């Protein structure tokens, strides 16, 4: 859903996020989940717009988080934003040891774990392996980290043996190339 709205230049962030929140709400209809989805949107948008201009991944993530925190700096969201406090200073967050990163599938932990993996690796493969090796809810953490890593490192950076193992690969490629 985020990628669909990122490529739509005629829609505002506020309108895109209303739709993203509706999609998030299908399974996780809580403001904290909406904020996490929104932060993901802003990070993904920063990667898509800044990486082609040679911005490093940390800069893209920082910019996306700043945009997200500014967007959600509203009276109704302030109490929930405190839960995302560790992500406000990426240098401090980067310095956290692995045993302080939770990967239990809880929305906040999943986003933090994905960002931590992105910051501690410099290749698509390494990022996903790091996410999986955190343990617990590995599919959630790897899906979030992998989506963002894929945007930054691109399809060509994916290990060929992983790409070859994808089921219905031709259908997925066609879907990705279609205008939705």
Where are these regions (language model features)?
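Extended hydrophobic-aromatic, low-complexity segments
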Residues: 124-128, 140, 159-161
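Conserved glycine-rich phosphate/nucleotide-binding loop
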Residues: 151-180
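Conserved phosphate/anionic-ligand binding catalytic regions in large, soluble enzymes, centered on
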Residues: 138-150
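Amphipathic alpha-helical interface segments
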Residues: 1-121, 127-133, 148
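Active/binding-pocket-proximal capping segment
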Residues: 134-135, 167
